Structures are given as structure tokens and as C-alpha cells.
Curated annotation (Swiss-Prot):
Residues spanning the membrane: none
Gene that specifies this protein: pyrC
Gene Ontology biological-process annotations: 'de novo' UMP biosynthetic process; purine nucleobase catabolic process
Coiled coil: none
Official protein name in the record: Dihydroorotase
Pathway(s) annotated for this protein in UniProt: Pyrimidine metabolism; UMP biosynthesis via de novo pathway; (S)-dihydroorotate from bicarbonate: step 3/3
HAMAP family registered for this protein in UniProt: PyrC_classI_B (MF_00220_B)
Domain of life: Bacteria
Organism, as annotated: Anaplasma phagocytophilum (strain HZ)
Protein task: Catalyzes the reversible cyclization of carbamoyl aspartate to dihydroorotate.
Cofactor: Zn(2+)
Active site: D328
Length: 447
């Protein structure tokens, strides 16, 4: 556990009375700079004041801390940036709220969440954006960012410029794809001028309509309509052809799940197009057979695919084709997941399990720890051009301390999230968040 003691001194040599914290005996890992050493980190107010290798005396002549946190050799890294979160406000407060979702994020070491716009009403105008920002200020203990919608509820394109001015980091219709090719091309054109990303839920609904799990052996065994892998790859292929017409635009594939789509992204990157993509832990840890064991808790969109697809996701992470890991945190009320699988809700929660599940790539799949952590911190921040996900003097102190070797069992009953829908209930994992810091303030501490 993280230990601490209190002194009540000020920075010597000045009149600053901001709260100061010294994190000592830490294994500092910063993927953005390649840093990995035992050392210390100092914060003052909301910012990182200094950090470095070796021993640090928090009561020395140069610095006396308001608080000293002994990390006991555990990893201290930048806070996790999750690009794909559904906090459900406004309109879905029975599933999740900004308050409960942000506490779930803090418990998972996630210091920045990027909300998807498929709320009720949709995040398609400045009024809804202002509402979300107000709720974040009132209730959130982590940084809340958001995507704006590409299209309005009436099917017309959103005013992307005004939404960007209101704080949108990019644009997507996640939950559904932008099916209209002309609208997608226009979105690329506007986004190129605004220098923001367009993110796509890659699915051709004409092929997937009515499907509930992957089209394959399991869907046939259960007699369920399946969602074919080409519904994803055809949409990715179409979008990349459109991107060639607007080569300065940035295209991001959300929750990629198939080898076919990944191969298309890999080729586009080699071509020099601005294409990035993300993958969820469930798509690199589980395959379609999980539906037989976990039932509705293993129903999500895109669905769990074949074992070949799952292994290709790991290969994509290893070779850099997949840029980052995101949760697609999709909370649902219990009654929405206890209906028959053919008609229950898609989606699972993921904020509180993101780090340990991602660490399975390090513990079990042979990826370097630096590579795994980069896909949770600096890489997602770069995609949406946020000055977060790294450790540097003067940056906001968003930090996570975690025990790399701690073994524990996932218990959804203990989640801070309002919803408990996860196929990882009862799974033994290794790696536990001990403390989460947002803007210099501790917002979560393990019991």
C-alpha cells in the first residue's frame, strides 16, 4: 500500500503557500520520454514542479513538502487517457452519471475520459456541450473531454466549428456509423480545416442489421443472427478511400475488432495517410466463445470475434498498427442486460478494469511494459492533441501509482460505476491502482 506522512512546511526561499507533495521511492515510468527509473516527483498546486532519479530528501534545504507519499518502489506514471467512454449524461442517468463514471475512472487510474456524443439529447450543439461541461465542473473528479456528433438527430451535418469552439476534441457518431459517404467526406473536409480528428464506429448496418454476436460458429450453434466481420472492414475501406480525397484529414477507427479491418489500416499507414485506431481489452483478451460462458455480459458492438481476430489485435498492438487502448465503457442497468441475448443491450463497463487487463499484454503476451503503458497514456493524448499523458515540468500533475505485481480478483459488486455489466467478473488479474492524482489532488486511494 502507499504510505504517507504529513509535514506542514512551505517551499523554502519563497512566499508560495500552495500545497506541495513529494512522491519518493517511486519507479517513474513516462512512455512519452522513455523514462524508467527509481526516483522522485514533486508537485506544487496543480503542476509537476520537478522529478528525477535517485534518492530525494523531502525535508532538505531546497524543498519541504506539505505531504510526502512513499511509493515503496511501485510504478508512478502519467494518468491514463481513455478516448472512448459513455458517461450517459444527459438522458441515461439510470445507467451512469458524471459523478459515478468519474469515480469509476479514478478507481481505474483514468484521469481523462473522452465522452461519446450518443447521449439524449445528442451532443450535436453548443447547448448540450455546455451542459456536459457544467456537470463535469459540478460532479467530476477527473478531466472530462468530449467528442461532438458528426450528424444531428435530423440527419444533417452538425456545425463542427461551433462545437470545436465549445471544446469538442473531435467528431464521431459512435454508437452508429456515419453511413452516408458524402457526409463522411464533408466531415473530413471540415475536420481538416479545424485540425481535429473524425472517429468512426466502423459498421455497415446493411450487413449487420439484426445481428447480436459475431457471425460464425457460435452464432450458428446458438441460432442467432450474426454480425459479419466484413461489416467492419467494408466501412474502414470506404472511409480510407474517402480519406485519399482529403489526405490532410485525420481518421480514427474506434474499437477495431477484425483482422481484415486491421490489415486495411496497416496498409493505409504505410501509404502515409493520417489513420489511427484503438482496441478494447475485451477484443484482445476474449473471443466469440466467451458468449457461451458469459451470455449477455459478453454482448457488445463490435462483437467478440474469432480467435484469429483476437490474436491479430495483439499483433497490431505489438507492431504499432493499433495506436492505443480504450475501454468503450458502456454501462447499462441490470434489467437491460438480463433480457434474452437477441434483444438485450450491447456493451460492457471497463474503466475499473482497464489497467490490469491491459497489463496482461505485459505479463502474459510478452509486450514491453513501456509499450503497453504508452498505449494508455501518451498515445491516446496525441491522437486528440491533449497536453496530457506524460510527465514533464510545468504540466498538470495527473498521475497514477500502481502495484505491477499485485494479484486480485475482479468483483463487479465493488465497482464505483453505477452499472456492473462485465464478462470479467471473477477473473484473476495482476496490477492494482493504489492512488490516482488529478491536477495535483488525490482523487482515489486504494483501501
Amino acid at each position: 500500500m502507499v504510505s504517507e506522512r504529513q509535514t506542514w512546511s512551505l517551499l523554502q526561499g519563497g512566499q508560495c503557500n500552495e500545497y506541495t507533495v513529494a512522491y519518493i521511492n517511486a519507479r517513474i515510468i513516462d512512455p512519452a520520454s522513455g523514462t524508467d527509473y527509481k526516483g522522485y516527483l514533486l508537485t506544487r498546486g496543480k503542476e509537476i514542479l520537478d522529478f528525477g532519479p535517485g534518492f530525494f530528501d523531502p525535508n532538505g534545504a531546497a524543498f519541504a513538502a506539505s505531504e510526502v507519499v512513499d511509493c515503496n518502489g511501485h510504478v508512478l506514471m502519467p494518468g491514463i487517457v481513455d478516448l472512448h467512454v459513455h458517461l450517459r449524461e444527459p438522458g441515461g442517468e439510470h445507467k451512469e452519471t458524471v459523478d459515478t463514471g468519474s469515480r469509476a475512472a479514478a478507481a481505474g487510474g483514468v484521469t481523462t475520459v473522452v465522452c461519446q456524443p450518443n447521449t439524449i439529447p445528442r451532443l450535436e450543439n453548443v447547448l448540450v456541450a455546455k451542459y456536459l461541461k457544467m456537470r463535469a465542473l459540478e460532479s467530476s473528479c477527473v478531466n472530462i473531454e468530449f467528442y461532438g456528433a458528426v450528424t444531428k438527430s435530423d440527419g444533417e451535418l452538425c456545425d463542427m466549428a461551433s462545437l470545436k469552439d465549445a471544446g469538442a476534441l473531435g467528431f464521431t457518431d459512435d454508437g452508429l456509423p456515419v453511413m452516408n459517404a458524402l457526409y463522411m467526406k464533408r466531415a473530413f473536409e471540415y475536420a481538416q480545416d479545424l485540425d481535429v480528428v473524425v472517429a468512426q464506429h466502423a459498421e455497415d448496418c446493411n450487413l449487420s442489421d439484426g445481428g447480436c454476436i459475431n457471425e460464425g460458429l457460435v452464432s450458428r450453434e446458438l441460432g442467432l443472427k450474426g454480425i459479419p466481420d466484413i461489416s467492419e472492414s467494408i466501412m474502414v475501406s470506404r472511409d480510407i478511400q474517402l480519406l485519399r480525397e482529403v489526405p490532410g484529414a485525420h481518421y480514427h477507427v474506434l474499437h477495431i475488432s477484425t483482422k481484415k479491418a486491421l490489415d486495411i489500416v496497416r496498409a493505409a499507414k504505410r501509404e502515409g495517410l493520417r489513420v489511427t485506431c484503438e482496441v478494447t481489452p475485451h477484443h484482445f483478451l476474449l473471443n466469440e466463445s466467451a458468449v457461451l460462458e458469459h451470455g449477455t455480459m459478453a454482448k457488445m458492438n463490435p462483437p467478440l470475434r474469432t480467435e484469429e481476430d483476437r490474436l491479430s489485435m495483439i499483433s497490431g498492438l505489438e507492431d504499432g498498427t493499433i495506436d492505443c487502448i480504450a475501454t468503450d465503457h458502456a454501462p447499462h442497468a441490470a434489467q437491460e442486460k438480463t433480457r434474452p441475448i437477441s434483444c438485450c443491450a450491447f456493451g460492457i463497463v471497463g474503466l475499473e478494469t482497464l489497467l490490469p487487463l491491459s497489463l496482461e499484454l505485459y505479463h502474459n503476451a510478452g509486450m514491453s511494459l513501456m509499450d503497453v503503458l504508452s498505449k494508455l497514456t501518451s498515445k491516446p493524448a496525441e491522437i486528440v492533441r491533449l497536453p496530457r499523458g506524460k510527465i514533464a515540468k510545468g504540466l498538470v500533475a495527473d498521475l497514477v501509482i500502481f502495484d505491477l505485481e499485485h494479484v486480485w480478483t475482479i468483483d463487479t459488486a465493488k465497482f464505483s460505476s453505477k452499472s456492473k455489466n462485465s464478462p470479467f467478473q471473477g477473473r484473476k488479474v495482476k496490477g492494482k491502482v493504489l492512488r490516482t492524482v488529478v491536477s495535483g489532488k488525490t482523487v482515489y486511494r486504494a483501501e
